[in-house]
């Protein structure tokens, strides 16, 4: 498996492909708007369970480097000050994945950051950490199924 396979899968995912990745937990990941040829500007609908919480949102690709990185900005009607970054690095026989959520305003908007902390709570962070440590090992089987 390579980092390019991971970023290609995430950039061109369909609901069916996403559901096969983690059945019953990954519900939807599909494009809702098409951006540039490099996927910047693409909007996707994501729907999955993070622990017991169902997370549904739209996200816009704001940065894409095939085989290296995808950055989505979360959107609920308007673009929010929250970003999901997936960075991949090819290593001998594997791919190292770094999954980061960044949230918060700059400037005067920082006064509203406590509202984000209500959503991105320590409990949510722990559930997301467990989720990511389960889902990314599963992607190998999704991209390279073993012979039955």
Task: Cite the ranges covered by each PLM segment.
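Short amphipathic alpha-helical segments
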Residues: 2-5, 127-131, 135
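Acidic, low-complexity intrinsically disordered regions
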Residues: 17-18, 68, 79, 101
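Beta-strand/loop substructures that line and gate deep hydrophobic ligand-binding cavities in soluble
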Residues: 74-130, 141
